């Protein structure tokens, strides 16, 4: 690799859309090849990876492969939430470097939040990398690849062209009965531990009509479950009508009216934005799944203040109480950070009490990971690693016990399952998910794949349920 990287500026001042990429047949001079994508991190990254594949299929005719050795273009979509995830990326890049040493003309690109955070530093650390692009510039991949091949030097584009990404994506392609739809990007909360505002930018909502059109297109292709995505999804304020804005509650109500949409989910939420309008949607919209992921992070007001979360434990419990008034049996999952700088034994016990009071069904819980550039990175950390691991173990054991109890109570009940496909453990059975995100395996004919089916839960296992189809 020769030359210094080209750094792409925003497309136009303010991020105005460029000419849309073609979504139709490949041009005669386009080279058909193979594309491999490795995805780390959250559901938003999974969505972005799918869009990378869509863009490169439309522009260059690239087809996905499960084997990097067969690929002409290799992309890694990165996550910078935790240090270990970041280091895994460079370890993986080192493996792929060997493919270039074999004389193949392979394009290797790094996208996602690590790319946004590190930029040209990635090229300096791994000079064999050809492309570095941020979450907001994945739509420019065809241009970046073309420029790399023509100019013979690496290309870097980690700009924040606001909503331009969505204006230039091909029409969505359904991959099964469930689909992700991104409705907003970025976060403006600036929690003291979090890198998201720095890697994905501040909150920008997609226009209301654009989201509704995408959902309708997916439903017409057989999608039955819509997962609305955003770093702070319930802060959605989509331009709507003449100078007005639609919130998440209105968006959910509108999507529920689209023919074919049988279940709606959304993630990830922030407690500050969990509004009465959204609670009313849980009351009024039966398609809205009986499940909520609402990250609380801690149960101590002192720690929540240090995290700059903007609410107290009592305020969090008040919102859950109002929600359960309209959905008494709703399952609640959350995120927890254990060992945040300055967290005392008393602080941790308050987190454990909150877990007991709420009865969380599931959690994504981690030991605090210092992220350079965030305010919390400057806080003194006096908690031993042994204590952090002990606290995490206690927390996870408590939540797992709650989850097991909920699963046991489901035995004998009728649950509606969206059938995803054959079971991985037994191809003669089907598998699907309940509203509260339980995987269910049951004997049934393959013609039910992609449909909602009522089943009776017959057994609760550690990580799944067993069931039988309700006789028609």
UniProtKB/Swiss-Prot annotation:
Radical SAM core domain boundaries: 173-407
Protein family: Belongs to the methylthiotransferase family. MiaB subfamily.
Gene from which the chain derives: miaB
TRAM domain mapped to chain residues: 408-471
Quaternary structure (record): Monomer.
Protein name (database record): tRNA-2-methylthio-N(6)-dimethylallyladenosine synthase
Role description: Catalyzes the methylthiolation of N6-(dimethylallyl)adenosine (i(6)A), leading to the formation of 2-methylthio-N6-(dimethylallyl)adenosine (ms(2)i(6)A) at position 37 in tRNAs that read codons beginning with uridine.
Pfam families listed in its UniProt record: Radical_SAM, TRAM, UPF0004
């Amino acid at each position: 690799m020769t030359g210094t990287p080209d750094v792409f500026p925003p497309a136009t001042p303010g991020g105005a859309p460029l000419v849309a990429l073609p979504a139709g047949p490949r041009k005669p001079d386009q080279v058909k090849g193979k594309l491999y994508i490795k995805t780390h991190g959250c559901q938003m990254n999974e969505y972005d990876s799918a869009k990378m594949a869509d863009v490169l299929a439309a522009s260059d005719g690239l087809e996905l492969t499960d084997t990097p050795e067969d690929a002409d273009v290799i992309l890694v979509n990165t996550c910078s939430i935790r240090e270990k995830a970041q280091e895994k990326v460079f370890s993986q890049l080192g493996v792929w470097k060997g493919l270039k040493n074999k004389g193949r003309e392979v394009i290797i690109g790094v996208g996602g939040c690590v790319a946004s955070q590190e930029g040209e530093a990635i090229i300096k650390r791994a000079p064999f990398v050809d492309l570095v692009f941020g979450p907001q510039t994945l739509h420019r991949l065809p241009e970046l690849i073309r420029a790399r091949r023509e100019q013979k030097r690496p290309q870097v584009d980690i700009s924040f062209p606001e909503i331009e990404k969505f204006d230039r994506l091909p029409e969505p392609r359904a991959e099964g009965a469930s689909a992700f739809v991104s409705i907003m990007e970025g976060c403006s909360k600036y929690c003291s531990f979090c890198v998201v505002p720095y890697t994905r930018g501040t909150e920008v909502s997609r226009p209301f009509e654009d989201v509704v059109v995408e959902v309708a297109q997916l439903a017409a292709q057989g999608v039955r479950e819509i997962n609305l995505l955003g770093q702070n999804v319930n802060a959605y304020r989509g331009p709507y009508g003449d100078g007005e804005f639609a919130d998440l509650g209105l968006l959910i109500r509108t999507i529920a009216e689209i023919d074919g949409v049988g279940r709606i989910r959304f993630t990830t939420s922030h407690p500050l934005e969990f509004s009465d309008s959204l609670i009313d949607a849980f009351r009024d919209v039966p398609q809205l799944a009986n499940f909520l992921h609402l990250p609380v992070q801690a149960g101590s007001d002192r720690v929540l203040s240090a995290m700059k979360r903007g609410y107290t434990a009592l305020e969090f419990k008040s919102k859950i109480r109002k929600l359960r008034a309209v959905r008494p049996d709703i399952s609640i999952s959350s995120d927890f950070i254990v060992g945040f700088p300055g967290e005392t034994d008393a602080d941790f016990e308050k987190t454990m009490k909150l877990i007991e009071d709420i009865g969380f069904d599931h959690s994504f819980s981690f030991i605090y990971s210092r992220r350079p550039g965030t305010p919390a990175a400057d806080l003194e950390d006096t908690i031993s690693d042994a204590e952090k691991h002990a606290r995490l173990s206690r927390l996870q054991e408590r939540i797992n016990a709650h989850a097991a109890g909920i699963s046991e109570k489901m035995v004998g009940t009728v649950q509606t399952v969206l059938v995803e496909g054959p079971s991985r453990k037994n191809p003669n059975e089907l598998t699907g998910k309940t509203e509260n995100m339980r995987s269910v395996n049951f004997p049934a004919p393959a013609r039910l794949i992609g449909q909602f089916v009522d089943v009776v839960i017959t057994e609760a296992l550690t990580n799944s349920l067993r069931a039988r189809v309700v006789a028609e």
